[in-house]
């Protein structure tokens, strides 16, 4: 059980993060090294893996970090459970763009975990999520957009949702989504499950 005053404090923090998100075109075609980060759980332990992959060769290396997670799962506050472990898992990895398993600005306070990590690290991030957290889906010119309060905050390709975290824009998300679910996140997901079993 999380006290109401703590959630209100965290909401204020999220609004501050959202104000510091930079939306600008990055250019997916310029990415040579891409990173992905994911997490799996066993009891109250979180197993986070960061993967750095060479776009051209497909070669990758990874780092893992295991830590205790005491904050409960509350929709909209995922960053409190996962961001600390994810940040530790990507420390020192070589990459130009970070893909985070979770939302960016397609979030009720425009401050999903990809936005939080992107702002804290001052780094280009895109959130790639398996379910919609907020907003309405609208089809335009063969692309499904996520609208929040009249603003486009994300796109849906297949069953996945892509939204800017920091230092990227919606066009970057579209270009990424058109390529299918990112291989670097598939690898990160596979490794978290493998490490969790060890």
Swiss-Prot record:
Query: What keywords is this UniProt entry annotated with?
Result: Cytoplasm, DNA damage, DNA repair, Endonuclease, Hydrolase, Magnesium, Metal-binding, Nuclease
User: What reaction gets catalysed by this protein?
Assistant: Endonucleolytic cleavage at apurinic or apyrimidinic sites to products with a 5'-phosphate
Q: Which domain of life is it from?
A: Archaea
Q: Name one GO molecular function term.
A: single-stranded RNA binding
GO cellular component, as recorded = cytoplasm
Q: Which family does it belong to?
A: Belongs to the endonuclease V family.
Q: What does this protein do?
A: DNA repair enzyme involved in the repair of deaminated bases. Selectively cleaves double-stranded DNA at the second phosphodiester bond 3' to a deoxyinosine leaving behind the intact lesion on the nicked DNA.
- Identify the HAMAP family for this entry: Endonuclease_5
Q: What is its EC number?
A: 3.1.21.7
Which top class of enzyme applies to this chain? hydrolase
List of residues binding Mg(2+): 38, 101
Q: Where in the cell is it found?
A: Cytoplasm
- For this entry, the protein name equals Endonuclease V
Q: Which cofactor does it need?
A: Mg(2+)
Swiss-Prot/TrEMBL GO biological process terms: DNA repair
